[in-house]
């Protein structure tokens, strides 16, 4: 059976060249990078090179601004701990990754006031609400650069400038943009930026935090000098080497993301032409090249995914961290997508390994699946939606 992987926002395949770079550090170069003998020296050299590779991809001015970690989305807690006690407010958005939302809820229980900025039906951030929430009481702004479900990009540069006008730190969750669009963090007012290697063909379990030189910071993990004293614990050299290699390869392949955008558009346009009652989530906004979220009205996204999987196609109904729930995702609810559409959202996310013939296979396979499921739907009759008064339409609670 043909296999097509279009769930790259959840994770990506490991690049063979990344694996090749990692292997010696699983077998031969097993020394501790903190050791000064001949076993530790190659590990330390590899660690320094990985800092340089990550800094180059992110556009950081100094390799020492990179902190390798297994938990890049811990940044809101890092930043809040570092700030002055009189600043007790944090700004985020309603469509952040569940890990960020959970961190903000934890801080809220500790007495912080959390401003959650709304989005419109296209997934665009309410900038008027954002400006109104800013004040000298705000310690931190923590928002994603691109939404993991829709691919919609936020105006990060403008937001960082506005945050600095009020003396707030600015953190950007860049997990879904690194390796997909050019980043020059050193030319922005971003104080902190987090990313994860497995989203751009690196290994799982390793990420990094960009921390602008001079930014206040107090580590959550203490007890060691590693990562310039900012992340205690013996370094995961194998994983870090893999992330460094993935960063270098991502830099090389960045120009090819234009082609990925063209493939995304091919998938999007052909499905819109062949399937009725389908909407593109955030289609009117700037998006990362490889993400498209389609809402197939009047059917369940989980059913679509199961039938796609039987045809060898891997996609997602939203964030991998929330899949398994039958409720529409918090992102769809925040965008106020109609219930009958929000339940039928499918996210296709491409990578540099995606080929045109795979896109064409999806375009040929999906419409019959939609027809089959709609034939069973109480909301669909004779090839079109049933009258609104003929069925019960649930609403969000």
UniProtKB/Swiss-Prot annotation:
InterPro entries: Aminotrans_V_dom, Aminotrans_V_PyrdxlP_BS, Cys_deSase_NifS_bac/arc, Cysteine_dSase, PyrdxlP-dep_Trfase, PyrdxlP-dep_Trfase_major, PyrdxlP-dep_Trfase_small. Its EC number is 2.8.1.7. The modification N6-(pyridoxal phosphate)lysine is found at residue 199. It comes from the Bacteria. Coiled coil: none annotated. [2Fe-2S] cluster binds at residue 321. SUPFAM superfamilies: PLP-dependent transferases. It holds the Pfam family Aminotran_5. The keyword Transferase applies. GO terms for biological process: amino acid metabolic process; nitrogen fixation. It catalyses: (sulfur carrier)-H + L-cysteine = (sulfur carrier)-SH + L-alanine. Its cofactor is pyridoxal 5'-phosphate. Gene3D superfamilies: 1.10.260.50, Aspartate Aminotransferase, domain 1, Type I PLP-dependent aspartate aminotransferase-like (Major domain). Disulfide bonds: none annotated. Keywords: Iron, Iron-sulfur, Metal-binding, Nitrogen fixation, Pyridoxal phosphate, Transferase. GO terms for molecular function: cysteine desulfurase activity; iron-sulfur cluster binding; metal ion binding; pyridoxal phosphate binding. The active site is at 321 (cysteine persulfide intermediate). Pyridoxal 5'-phosphate binds at residues 148, 176, 196-198, 234. Belongs to the class-V pyridoxal-phosphate-dependent aminotransferase family. NifS/IscS subfamily. Homodimer. Catalyzes the removal of elemental sulfur atoms from cysteine to produce alanine. Seems to participate in the biosynthesis of the nitrogenase metalloclusters by providing the inorganic sulfur required for the Fe-S core formation. This is Cysteine desulfurase. It comes from Klebsiella pneumoniae.
